[in-house]
Amino acid sequence: MDKNLIVDYINQNHFGKLLGMDFEVLSPGVIEYKMIVEEKHLATPFAAHGGAIAALIDASLGVACLSKVFSEAKVVSTIEFSMKFHKPALKGRLLIAKASVISAGKRILVSESKIYDGEELIASASGTFNAYPKEKAGY
């Protein structure tokens, strides 16, 4: 496993840092992404903006795929994802996105993710990703 590519990704992911997101690779293709809902994420006095939740779920889908292909010196980009919101994400709560790759070809990967607040399902999604050589992304 080329752990340096994951470290490089963490260091270069300025958007994830801005939103306060952090992830852990549990195994190739399986990750958890975490974010505490803060004031900067809110659309109402109590609930996160859907875009903040969409960013977390897209990141989790993508990093699950990245963790599957980075040992091949590849990175991924989102082709598409479909998402459902189930409950609001409330201020101060820790959200955990659990994502895994369900299909992996040479170039196309599909992943699924669910965001939880404790045991409450907040959102779910599936996405399709393109894998390509890391040099094309500047790594």
Regions of interest found by a model, annotated:
Residues M1-Y139:
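Terminal targeting signals and extreme-terminal segments of soluble enzymes
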